[in-house]
């Protein structure tokens, strides 16, 4: 029996509110993080991802009190990212109730960080988050600090490097900056290139505008999980509608 594919609503949090932008800018308010998370828990989302989108830019820690508040109210796996730079940050997030932590910018500055964290905490709770922008045909580059800083690093090569070996990251959260918030679907070439290249689950992110896009991420992109925000935040679709649509397309999901 194939493993069920996961639907993961994403809470981008800025100044204590859930927000959603387009291509990492043009931010709109989408509600209180705890209330939004409770709704997704009630709707039977498979997981929730909480990203403090300005923590790395502002050089501060993730909003731990909000992670604690969400973890008290939801009973599905919670991934937390933003401003996590070292082992003490990971421990604080796990103690606050997170099940997994997503590392993005910090891994660029310390490429050994993922291995160190996976060895200490287990690869199952370490996610490498990659924000990728297309720079030419079949080539994507990593950007950091909320998509503001170019690194010159090839996104697919980085995904391979960060997941190889026993102490690599256990998952890849792969966001297309070109597609983010545009609602035209995932960058399927990017998603497929990554899923073909690594041996750990790929979470496709960036671009979902309708339910069909979720299925495309799995069937064409090879994703193990699909992440979306605005189609759920603003009430266009429910999690159950999304799962039913994926099931109708022959995808195994947990209803």
UniProtKB/Swiss-Prot annotation:
Subcellular location: Cytoplasm
One example of a Gene Ontology biological process annotation: L-histidine biosynthetic process
InterPro entries the record matches: Aldolase_TIM, His_biosynth, HisF, IGPS_HisA/HisF, RibuloseP-bd_barrel
Catalysed conversion reaction: 5-[(5-phospho-1-deoxy-D-ribulos-1-ylimino)methylamino]-1-(5-phospho-beta-D-ribosyl)imidazole-4-carboxamide + L-glutamine = D-erythro-1-(imidazol-4-yl)glycerol 3-phosphate + 5-amino-1-(5-phospho-beta-D-ribosyl)imidazole-4-carboxamide + L-glutamate + H(+)
Molecular function terms, GO-annotated: imidazoleglycerol-phosphate synthase activity; lyase activity
GO CC list: cytoplasm
This protein's record includes keyword Cytoplasm: yes
UniProt pathway annotation: Amino-acid biosynthesis; L-histidine biosynthesis; L-histidine from 5-phospho-alpha-D-ribose 1-diphosphate: step 5/9
Active site: 12, 131
EC number(s) given by UniProt: 4.3.2.10
Enzyme class: lyase
Domain of life (superkingdom): Bacteria
UniProt KW keywords: Amino-acid biosynthesis, Cytoplasm, Histidine biosynthesis, Lyase
Annotated SUPFAM superfamilies: Ribulose-phoshate binding barrel (SSF51366)
PANTHER family cross-referenced by the UniProt entry: IMIDAZOLE GLYCEROL PHOSPHATE SYNTHASE HISHF, IMIDAZOLE GLYCEROL PHOSPHATE SYNTHASE SUBUNIT HISF/H IGP SYNTHASE SUBUNIT HISF/H
NCBIfam families (alphabetical): hisF (TIGR00735)
Quaternary data: Heterodimer of HisH and HisF.
Family: Belongs to the HisA/HisF family.
Primary role: IGPS catalyzes the conversion of PRFAR and glutamine to IGP, AICAR and glutamate. The HisF subunit catalyzes the cyclization activity that produces IGP and AICAR from PRFAR using the ammonia provided by the HisH subunit.
Protein name: Imidazole glycerol phosphate synthase subunit HisF
Annotated source species: Ruthia magnifica subsp. Calyptogena magnifica
């Amino acid at each position: 029996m194939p493993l069920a594919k996961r639907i993961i609503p994403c809470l981008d949090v800025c100044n204590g509110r859930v927000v959603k932008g387009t291509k990492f800018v043009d931010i709109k308010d989408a509600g209180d993080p705890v209330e939004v998370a409770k709704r997704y828990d009630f709707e039977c989302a498979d997981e929730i991802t909480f990203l403090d989108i300005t923590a790395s830019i502002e050089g501060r820690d993730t909003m731990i009190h909000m992670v604690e508040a969400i973890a008290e109210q939801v009973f599905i796996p919670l991934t937390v990212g933003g401003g996590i730079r070292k082992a003490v940050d990971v421990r604080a997030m796990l103690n606050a109730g997170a099940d997994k932590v997503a590392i993005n910018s910090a891994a660029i500055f310390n490429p050994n960080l993922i291995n160190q964290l996976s060895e200490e905490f287990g690869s199952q709770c370490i996610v490498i988050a990659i924000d990728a922008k297309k720079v030419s045909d079949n080539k994507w580059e990593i950007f950091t600090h909320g998509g503001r800083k170019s690194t010159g690093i090839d996104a697919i090569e980085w995904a391979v490097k960060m997941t190889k070996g026993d102490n690599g990251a256990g998952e890849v959260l792969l966001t297309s900056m070109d597609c983010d918030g545009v609602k035209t679907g995932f960058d399927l070439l990017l998603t497929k290139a990554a899923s073909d290249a690594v041996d750990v689950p790929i979470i496709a992110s960036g671009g979902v505008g309708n339910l069909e896009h979720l299925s495309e991420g799995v069937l064409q992109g090879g994703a193990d999980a699909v992440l979306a925000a605005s189609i759920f935040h603003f009430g266009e679709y429910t999690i159950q509608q999304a799962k039913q649509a994926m099931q109708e397309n022959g995808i195994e999901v947990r209803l």
